[in-house]
UniProtKB/Swiss-Prot annotation:
Transmembrane segments: none annotated. This is NADH-quinone oxidoreductase subunit D 2. It comes from Stenotrophomonas maltophilia (strain R551-3). It is found in: Cell inner membrane. NDH-1 shuttles electrons from NADH, via FMN and iron-sulfur (Fe-S) centers, to quinones in the respiratory chain. The immediate electron acceptor for the enzyme in this species is believed to be ubiquinone. Couples the redox reaction to proton translocation (for every two electrons transferred, four hydrogen ions are translocated across the cytoplasmic membrane), and thus conserves the redox energy in a proton gradient.
Length: 435
């Protein structure tokens, strides 16, 4: 035994061994990781399970949208906006269209403004449902995703009804919207899964117009949000994964240029719909939900409350639109295309349409910045025109880029499993981050 003890002493006193130290190691999180939501790559410096540093690598979804817009007429870049934050399509369009309207000195008719307000809020619910389902799935709550996508499917049908597309709508146009709200809704067709009485029940709310469908939806949606809250709000595992995780202080939120839920979750009441009203937000009644602690759980509660407020706004817009028919495009034929009926009989209308969509129109020289309160934060478009039919410069202010920039300072000291919860509540979409 004494011999073994002496050998141990010799081992401990070896000069080579006494200089050894435990060093941190680096780990790649993404872009293949399912919680990276597409193309996020984080290089994490780890001390065991604790994160000491996070280095986000972006650009894997860079498509040069800002440069592409410089080679297209103003009205041909609306489709690019849909593909930035491809979960909040019409809100992106709204910022770009507003910037063109400001430079041209035109204003959309009142009905078009209400339609834009309506679809901005539909888009907000669509975004928050996608966020809720995917974030809950990342943390192990699979049922919530199935519930959230049930309602999301109905609102996607509203997109399809007005534009013909379920995602990339290109519905907002400078001077108004593409067309008025339809008097019918897409219906489910008989299939192996939907037939007989079940099919009839599915189509019961789709017999009337889009506004009738939305009126029915707004009556039912608060109960659906209650179901999400039943599954998550007091769920012990959900609270263990989110309470006290990823705390963003008000000072930090200001320093990093955060907007939207990231700012309001920290208790700062900044919302462009209230502070810088656009469209018809000054004519509708709604509240700004605020958090207290600035953690992942508070951001979840704020988004849940925002869905309820969006539902209130939609209800008010539907009531106004039902009572007030009118034009949805400005009577300025420099930007407004001719009607389809006119193009069948009038050669001049056909030529006008062709010139409008092939060459576009010249926008007076100048610069402007237009921003909207998108579901993820302040989405802004800085537009410079030199008087030609194409932008001289387009710069897009994506809220997700500022939020992702802060991730290093927020995740330090947390465990590896907490990264998933934090990335989830950042609500990142890399179409807008990388642009």
């Amino acid at each position: 035994m004494s011999h073994v003890h002496q050998a141990g002493e010799a081992f401990a006193s070896s000069p080579a061994e006494s200089r050894q130290e435990i060093r941190n190691y680096t780990m790649n999180f993404g872009p293949q990781h399912p919680a990276a939501h597409g193309v996020l790559r984080l290089i994490l410096e780890m001390d065991g399970e604790t994160i000491m540093r996070a280095d986000p690598h972006v650009g894997l979804l860079h498509r040069g949208t800002e440069k592409l817009a410089e080679s297209k007429p103003f009205n041909q870049s609306i489709g690019y906006m849909d593909r930035l934050d491809y979960v909040s399509m019409m809100c992106n369009e709204h910022a770009y269209v507003r910037s063109i309207e400001t430079l041209m000195g035109i204003e959309a008719p009142e009905r078009a403004q209400y339609i834009r307000t309506l679809f901005d809020e539909i888009t907000r619910i669509l975004n928050h449902l996608m966020w809720l389902g995917s974030n809950a799935l990342d943390l192990g709550a699979m049922a919530v995703m199935l519930y959230a996508f049930r309602e999301r499917e109905e609102l996607m049908d509203c997109y399809e009804a007005v534009s013909g597309a379920r995602m990339h709508a290109a519905y907002y146009r400078p001077g108004g919207v593409y067309r008025d709200l339809p008097d019918h809704m897409p219906k489910y067709k008989e299939s192996r899964w939907h037939k007989g009485k079940a099919l009839k029940n599915l189509n019961a709310a789709r017999e009337g117009s889009l506004l009738d469908f939305l009126e029915n939806f707004t009556n039912e949606f608060p109960g659906r949000v209650d179901e999400y809250e039943t599954l998550l709000t007091d769920n012990r595992i959900w609270k263990q994964r989110t309470v006290g995780i990823g705390v963003v202080t008000p000072e930090l939120a200001h320093q990093w240029g955060m907007t939207g839920v990231m700012l309001r979750g920290s208790g700062i009441a900044w919302d462009l719909r209230k502070k810088r009203p656009y469209a018809k937000y000054d004519a509708v009644d709604f509240d700004i939900p605020l958090g207290k602690e600035g953690d992942c759980y508070d951001r979840y509660l704020v988004r849940i409350a925002e869905m309820r407020e969006s539902n209130r706004i939609i209800k008010q817009c539907v009531a106004w639109l039902k009572a007030n028919p009118g034009p949805v495009m400005v009577k300025n034929f420099k930007v407004a295309p001719p009607k389809r009926e006119d193009m069948k009989d009038d050669m001049e209308a056909l030529i006008h349409h062709f010139k409008l969509f092939s060459e576009g129109y010249c926008v007076p020289a100048g610069e402007t910045y237009a921003a909207v309160e998108a579901p993820k934060g302040e989405f802004g478009c800085y537009l410079v025109s030199d008087g030609a039919n194409k932008p001289f410069r387009v710069h897009l202010r994506a809220p997700g880029f500022a939020h992702l920039s802060s991730i290093d300072s927020i995740v330090r000291g947390h465990m590896l499993a907490d990264v998933v919860a934090m990335i989830g509540t950042y609500d990142l979409v890399f179409g807008e981050v990388d642009r």
